[in-house]
Amino acid sequence: MNLSLFLARKIFLDKGDKRKVSRPAIHIATAGVAIGLAVMIISVCVVLGFKHTIRDKVIGFGSHIQVGNFLSLQSQGTEQYPVAMNDSMMNVLKHISGIKHVQRFAYKQGLLKTNNDFLGVNFKGVGPEWDSTFIANSMIEGTIPHFDDKASHNKILVSKTMADKLNLKSNQKIFAYFIDNNGVRARRFTICGIYETNLKKYDQIMCFCDLYTARKLNGWEEDQVSGAELQVENFEQLPIVANRIIGKVNKTVDHYGETYSSSTIKEINPQIFAWLGLMDLNVWVILGLMLAVAGITMISGLLIIILERTNMIGILKALGARNKTIRHTFLWMSVFIIGRGLLIGNIIGLGLIVLQQYTSLIKLDPQTYYVSTVPVEFNWLYIVLINIATMLICTFILIAPSYVISKINPAKSMHYE
C-alpha cells in the first residue's frame, strides 16, 4: 500500500485522537463541504425545474414554432391576417426533418359578457389535430370538448382567471360578442371546462373554441387560418429545425397571395426566455460562492491539522520521509474529509429535493413566479459533475497550503507540542 495513503487513513480513522483543535477543524471543514454541495445540488435542481416548467407552459400555448402570415408575425399578433393551410402545406410542414407534430389555429378577439360584467378575451380556434396534453394537465373543472374544423359546437374552455372575474362555472351558458366591419355579432357558448396554468399573460386572455367557429367569425375561407403550430422532436435542435423551415416555407406565397413566414417560441416571447436565461448566471454565481466556502474551510482545516501534527511531521522527516510523501499524506487526508462532506452533502441535498418533489412543501405565489410550488428536476449528469468538480477543485486548491510542510524543521518540530 502507498505509504502516504496508509498514514492518511490511520490519522483520519484514529478515534482515540484527543486533540482539542484538529477534530473540530475537521468537523467544520466537513460541514463546509457538505453544506456547499447541498446548496449547489438544490440550486441546480430548482433552477432546472423552474426553467423547464415555465418553458413548457409557454410552449403549451404557442408550441415551438409558428408558421403564419408574414404580416401577422410582424405585428406580433396584434393584427390577424389569414394564410392558407391546406393539406398540401400541412404535408410540407410534417415532412420537414425534426418536426414531431403540426396543428392549425385561428385567433379571434371578442367579449365574454354576463349580466353583471364583461371581459375582453382572445378566442383561439383549434381543430381535431390539436394536442391538448398541456391544457388537460391544467384542467381544474369540467372536461375538454371535441374541437372540430367542419362544424360549430359552440363549446369553449376558459381560464380560472376569467371564471373568477365573471363568476363562471363549468356547463354554464355565456354570450360572446364580436365586432367586425359588419357590426356586432353575438354567439352563445357553453363553458365545458376551466383551466389554470398560472401563466398570467395567457390565463387573462386565452379562451379555446373550435377552429370552424374562429374561422367563420373572421370571415375567412375554408382553408384559411391564422397559422400552424409546430412541435419539434428535440428542443435543443430548435434553431436548426427553424432554419429548415425558413428555407422551405418562408417568403413563399399561397394561392390568395399571402406570404408565409415563421417564428420560434423564443422570438415570440423574448422577455420570458431572456429572464429564464438569467437564471443560469445566478446558478454560476451560487456554484462559485459555495465552492469558495468549501475551499476556504478546507484550507483552514488543513493548516490547523498540519499545525497540530508538527511533531509527527518532524519525526517522519527524521526517519527519512521526503516532503513530497508527507504532503501527499495530508492531501490524502483532505480527500477523505472532502469525501465525507460530499456524502453528507448528497444525502442532505437529494433528500430535500425528493421531499419537495413528493410533498410540494415549499409554496410560491403563482402571481409572481407562475408556479404554486417550487419545481424541481433531477439531472444525474449535473449532480455527478458537481460532485467531481467539488472534489477536484477543493483538492487542487489545497496543494499550495500543503507546501507549508517543507518549511518545518525536524530538529525544532520534534520538541513541539
Would you name each region that the model predicts?
Residues 303-305, 312-357:
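Transmembrane alpha-helical interface segments in multi-pass membrane proteins
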Residues 16-27, 241-244, 248-295, 305-307:
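Peri-transmembrane interface segments
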Residues 40-49, 280-318, 326-329, 401-402:
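A hydrophobic alpha-helix feature that marks transmembrane segments and, especially
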Residues 23-25, 35-65:
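Alpha-helical transmembrane segments
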Residues 1-37:
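N-terminal Sec/SRP start-transfer signal
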Residues 340-388, 399-403, 407:
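Short helix-loop junctions at transmembrane helix boundaries
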Residues 82-223:
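A structural signal for hydrophobic secondary-structure junctions
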Residues 51-86:
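Membrane-interface junction motifs in transport/secretion proteins
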